[in-house]
Swiss-Prot record:
Signal sequence region: 1-21
GO molecular function, one term: carbonate dehydratase activity
Gene3D superfamilies attached to this UniProt entry: Carbonic anhydrase
Organism: Rickettsia prowazekii (strain Madrid E)
Protein name: Uncharacterized protein RP050
InterPro entries: Carbonic_anhydrase_sf (IPR036874), Pro_CA_2 (IPR046871)
Domain of life: Bacteria
Alphabetically ordered keywords of this record: Signal
Length: 188
């Protein structure tokens, strides 16, 4: 009887996946996908100096990669993406996001000898709008101050839990312009 339930469950799951694939033209015909192999030197590399904590927003994927390259961190970072980036660590509604970040830092330190954290927030962030409210974001200056406050809280949390790590904080515009956010930011 249990075996029959297992077979029926597997059939339902496979049928659901096939139905999804049939209605999703992007992946429907993709049985095997070949992607370019990593650079040869990366295959045996065991160290990533940095964890990048960035937003999940699809609009800035290329710009984020370009930033990491300009910072000299291309091929030497692990990436953690959650809505709001630094806000994921400090928000009070989804506290498990913060725990996820902390647990990830802990394990990546053991695996990759992490030395620093880079938080990359971005302007016009939907998570910020939902979790802290548009009234704190409705001008460029208010938005920068809101991000700076959250980035500084995130920096403090990381420094307290992982005092050996350096922490850097950045704010990216949708135009790709990136500002480093320092601890002593004040509205101008």
């Amino acid at each position: 009887m249990i075996y029959m339930k297992y077979i029926i469950s597997c059939f339902i799951i496979v049928s659901s996946l096939n139905l999804y694939a049939a209605h999703n033209n992007v992946i429907a015909d993709k049985k095997v996908i070949k992607v370019a192999a990593s650079k040869e030197h990366l295959k045996t590399l065991k160290v990533a100096s940095t964890i990048l904590i960035s937003c999940v927003d699809f609009r800035l994927i290329n710009e984020t990669s370009k930033l990491m390259k300009q910072l000299g961190l291309e091929d030497t970072f692990d990436k953690v993406s959650l809505p709001g980036a630094s806000l994921a660590l400090v928000n009070e509604k989804y506290t498990y996001w913060g725990k996820t970040i902390e647990d990830t830092i802990e394990i990546l330190q053991a695996l990759h000898n992490i030395e620093q954290i880079v938080f990359l927030d971005h302007r016009e962030c939907g998570a910020y709008n939902i979790l802290i409210g548009n009234e704190h974001l409705n001008t460029k200056e208010k938005e920068k101050v809101a991000h700076a406050e959250i980035l500084n809280k995130a920096r403090d949390i990381i420094r307290e839990k992982f005092p050996q790590l350096k922490v850097y904080t950045f704010l990216m515009g949708l135009d790709g312009v990136v500002e480093q956010i320092y601890e002593d930011i004040t509205p101008s």
